[in-house]
Swiss-Prot record:
Inhibited by UTP. It catalyses: UMP + ATP = UDP + ADP. GO terms for molecular function: ATP binding; UMP kinase activity. This is Uridylate kinase.
Length: 259
């Protein structure tokens, strides 16, 4: 599939046929809070439905930080081994996936939750061919449990699954407008980047995804679009290839496919 930077398209055009939508666990909670907010769930679900109705096949990878973040939990609880804490974090992603599934179902989408961990009473086992088949049948799939191994972030899981299902792009949903030179909430002079190469992300130590995820995307030329999902309609704009957020990809494509 082509690795090209998005450009402005007439309304209704679809730039990306199949995407991985990476949601943080915190995106399901109210700002600054933990747990799951019904209002946040439905707001995200409605945006996903609009993007799906445009013809895009959508696979979602969500985090679990609104419930439990493995690395930080083990640091604060000496009696819990780090590997165990990571498995607990994976189970948190399953909880989030079930909540998101019901929200999507409630507004008329067909969904499947697939898990890298065996939880067959509530989710299917992740099998690559089955996942692709669900997408081809018009279902939204929610991929939980990371990749089923500790010490691997859900960012890396998103990169891995994007390669497996041959997604055109990873859409990383955040609460800010893209990738900045510094934390925009702390530094009002932080600069928003329109486009970056993978190497620039690494060299500038920009907080986009973890190093393993960036390395995977770099090696396989899988582009990433970082955008603000809190702005209504941005998920649809992203799948159409409109100028939204920060595009990260191969330097050649970044230079020759200006938005």
């Amino acid at each position: 599939m082509p690795d090209i930077a998005p450009s402005s398209q007439p309304e209704g055009d679809l730039r990306y046929r199949r995407v991985i939508l990476k949601l943080s666990g915190e995106s399901l909670a109210e700002s600054g809070k933990r747990g799951i907010s019904d209002n946040e769930l439905l707001a995200i679900a409605k945006q996903i439905k609009s993007a799906h109705e445009s013809g895009c096949q959508i696979a979602i990878v969500n985090g679990g930080g609104n419930i439990l973040r493995g690395a930080s939990f083990s640091g604060a609880n000496a009696s819990v081994q780090e590997a165990t804490a990571h498995y607990m974090g994976m189970l948190a992603t399953v909880i989030n996936s079930l909540a998101l599934q019901d929200a999507l179902d409630s507004i008329g989408l067909q969904t499947r939750v697939m898990s890298a961990l065996p939880v067959d009473r509530v989710a299917e086992q992740f099998i690559r061919r089955r996942a692709i088949r669900h997408l081809e049948k018009g279902r939204v799939i929610i991929l939980s449990g990371g990749i089923g191994s500790p010490f691997v972030t859900t960012d890396t899981a998103a990169a891995q699954r994007a390669l497996e299902i041959e997604a055109d792009v990873i859409l990383k949903a955040t609460r800010v407008d893209g990738v900045y030179s510094d934390d925009p909430e702390k530094n009002p002079h932080a600069v928003l980047y329109e486009q970056l190469s993978y190497n620039e992300v690494i060299q500038k130590k920009l907080r986009v995804m973890d190093a393993t995820a960036i390395a995977l995307c770099n090696e396989h030329r899988k582009p990433i679009l970082v955008f603000n999902f809190k702005q209504d309609g941005n998920i649809v704009r992203a799948v159409r290839g409109e100028s939204v957020g920060t595009w990260i990809g191969d330097p050649q494509d970044t230079q020759t496919n200006q938005r």
